Structure formats: structure tokens, C-alpha cells
């Protein structure tokens, strides 16, 4: 089997719905921390328009970025799901889910991981790692979304 195929998969609709429901619950509970990767090594060679920093500042200019991300992540649906990917750099962490949404007539690529672990060693807090929240370099196609009608 192709290594790339092992790293990417399409989860069943029920699994994706469960993930989205848990994501919303974690955000609404108020106990989740958002870890937003604003500056990424890959961004050094990328057009600034396609970086996390630019996209969030452009879409939510007068908002606290963490609060804006919490709101936007809580609005994700099964229809926004694209795929699930394994993070080779951190193989013991949970898989990352990739979603896509349209904002101001531009596609936004969203890649997140929810870790239900204690990162502060005190309160049992969970965290959501937002690796990507940036304008898509390549426009999405309908077939990118397995659960859109």
C-alpha cells in the first residue's frame, strides 16, 4: 500500500459527526485551550496571503484571535470535513482532521487536532491545536468534501 494512503483517510460520517460534536462540547465547556500555530516554518517560503497569521488577521481584524477561532471551530459541520491525516512528527498524538470553509468568497483550509490530555498538569485541561487556518492556495472542489450533498 502506498505510504501516502496510510497517512490519509476518510472517516465514516458517524465518526466525523462524533468528532465535531466532541469539538463543540469541548469549546462550549470553557475548559479547552486553543493552541494556534500563528507562525509556522512552512510559511517562510509561502506567499503571505496563505499564512495563518494573515488569514486570521484579515478575517477577524477587530477580534481576539483565540475567541474568533473558538467560534469558527464550533461552527464546523460534517459537510466541511475533507479528510483525516496522521502527524508523522508526533505519531503518538491523535490524528488531525482537515476541514474547509468559505469566508468572503475565499476557501479556508483548516487542520486541527483535539487532545484530551492535561497540558498544565493541574486541571486536566484539554487543548485544540490549530495547525492551519489559512486561505487555500488551491481552490476546493466539491469532490474534496465526502459528506456534502
Question: Could you say what each language-model-derived stretch is?
Answer:
Residues 74-124:
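Functional cores of ribonucleases/endoribonucleases
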Residues 10, 27, 34, 82, ...:
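Weak global preference for isoleucine
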Residues 2-93:
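Compact soluble domain cores
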Amino acid at each position: 500500500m502506498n505510504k501516502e494512503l496510510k497517512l490519509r483517510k476518510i472517516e465514516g460520517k458517524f465518526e466525523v459527526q462524533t468528532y465535531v460534536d466532541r469539538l463543540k462540547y469541548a469549546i462550549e465547556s470553557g475548559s479547552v485551550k486553543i493552541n494556534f500555530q500563528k507562525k509556522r516554518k512552512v510559511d517562510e517560503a509561502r506567499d503571505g496571503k496563505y499564512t495563518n497569521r494573515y488569514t486570521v488577521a484579515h478575517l477577524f481584524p477587530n477580534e481576539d484571535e483565540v475567541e474568533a477561532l473558538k467560534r469558527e471551530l464550533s461552527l464546523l459541520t460534517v459537510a466541511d470535513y475533507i479528510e483525516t491525516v496522521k502527524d508523522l512528527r508526533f505519531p503518538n498524538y491523535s490524528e488531525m482532521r482537515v476541514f474547509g470553509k468559505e469566508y468572503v468568497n475565499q476557501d479556508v483550509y483548516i487542520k486541527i487536532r483535539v487532545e484530551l490530555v492535561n497540558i498544565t498538569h493541574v486541571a486536566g485541561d484539554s487543548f485544540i491545536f490549530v495547525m492551519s487556518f489559512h486561505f487555500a492556495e488551491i481552490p476546493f472542489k466539491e469532490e474534496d468534501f465526502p459528506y456534502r450533498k
